[in-house]
Every structure is written in structure tokens, then in C-alpha cells.
């Protein structure tokens, strides 16, 4: 077993990837689109649909425009990182595996206060919900743990287990720093490189874009066009490209929200429009996999 320097953000990610690879997960790459959470990645949203098994893990950059603070808040970012683990069907020892993963990154579970606090999860735009827990480490939420019950309006059978690590929060605890920007990303031949060195300017400028410069009219047009394109692609039987349009529409909506361009009443209407697209994608994807004979079911352990 290779040892990684989990006192760096880079080493923390490598250690988690190594641990979950040894548990049989496919280590896939981040989605190359703007999404608000790792759950949007097709490896979670689409692979939770239908009977086919899938164990995977990946880092996902997440964008939440309304959370930007111009780089002035030490704990809030408009772009941050999640480490996502998806286990389908969910193994009986999934909680034990999570606790072992904490040990691997240098957190002694025998001396720290680790609590599973009931917090059922829901994503209105994805038509998804699940039974879940927030996992608290010494009073700070660091992970969300969910058993998916429904995705895209479809019942999940078998149930998918999802573990979402908040990488920045865990790293702040492991490194003992009070600001995300003080996190050591890596410590190499050229010295220490911090999170702030890499991302602070991005937080300042992207916050300015999200709150001040994003073109509202263009975003409304983009949302409407993505909605139309997704519907056309569903009619053409192309669930995966249709889903990409759903994600683009969702990000346009999030930017409009940051620009305060949508009223409370309109907000719910837009959420329902994205939800309708997500459900159509889920049904189309299920139908396509069913027509293929659910090929990954051959990997189910008898």
C-alpha cells in the first residue's frame, strides 16, 4: 500500500483514490461541465438508474455561484471540490468502509467525535431523494452519506450508496488551518503551494462575474435553448447528450439566481422545468439500457 502525504490537499485526494480503488471502485475523471454537486456526474445520476451494478469514485469540481464571496470569506467558495463514491448495490459494510477511509487519511476514529446525524437528502432539479446522514467530525460536517431511493423520478433498485466528502473541510481539519486559502495543496521541490496561490484570484474574478457581469438576457435565452435541445434529443433517443443540456440549463439557472433575476415564484417554476427534463432523461436512459439487455448485470455477483 502506497503512502501519501495527507497533510497536503493533493495527497489527501491521492489517498482517497487509492483507498477506494482497493475496494474495487473504478476511479473515473471529473465531469468537464459546470455542475453544482458531484451527484450530477453521469456516474452517479445515470448509473443509479436501473439494475446494473457500478462502483466508482471521482473528484468533482462543483460550482455554486451564489456561494461566492470575492475571496474574502475563509470558509465559502463559489467553486470547490467534492470526492464522490458511488456503490451500487450498496454494500452492508458501507459505513465501516467510510470510517476506514478516514483512518487512511490520518483521522483516528477512536479518539475523534464522529457522528452520523440523520439528514435525508433531496435534489429537486434531479427528481432525486434518499435516506441519509450528515457525518460530523468534532462538530463540523465533513461528509454526506445517502442511500438513493429515487433518481429522475424512478425508484432505485438496487439502492445506490453515495458518499460525498467535502474535501476542503476535511483538509482544513487534517492540516489544522482556519482558512481554505491557507491549505497546502502540495509541498514539492519548488516549496509549498497553497490553495490560495492556485484559486484565490479565480474566486475574486468569478464572484464578480456571477454577481455583476453575467448577461441576464443571454442566460434566459440559454436556459430556453437548452430546454428545447434536451427535449429534441430525448425524442431522438439520445439520453446522454440530452442530459448534458439539462446540466447546462441548471447552471444557467444558478447564474440567474446569483444575479437575482428570478423571483421566488419564478424560481420554483424553473426548478420544475429542470426536474421535468431530468425525469425525461432518466426514463430515456432506462429504456436504452433495457433495450441493450442491461449489459453490466453480467458483473453481478451470484
Curated annotation (Swiss-Prot):
It is found in: Cytoplasm. GO terms for molecular function: ATP binding; glycine-tRNA ligase activity. It holds the Pfam family tRNA-synt_2e. GO terms for cellular component: cytosol. Disulfide bonds: none annotated. It is an enzyme of class 6 (ligase). InterPro entries: aa-tRNA-synth_II/BPL/LPL, Gly-tRNA-synth_heterodimer, Gly-tRNA_ligase_asu. Keywords: Aminoacyl-tRNA synthetase, ATP-binding, Cytoplasm, Ligase, Nucleotide-binding, Protein biosynthesis. CDD domains: GlyRS_alpha_core (cd00733). Its EC number is 6.1.1.14. It catalyses: tRNA(Gly) + glycine + ATP = glycyl-tRNA(Gly) + AMP + diphosphate. HAMAP family: Gly_tRNA_synth_alpha. Belongs to the class-II aminoacyl-tRNA synthetase family. NCBIfam families: glyQ, PRK09348.1. PANTHER family: GLYCINE--TRNA LIGASE, CHLOROPLASTIC_MITOCHONDRIAL 2, GLYCYL-TRNA SYNTHETASE. This is Glycine--tRNA ligase alpha subunit. It comes from Psychromonas ingrahamii (strain DSM 17664 / CCUG 51855 / 37).
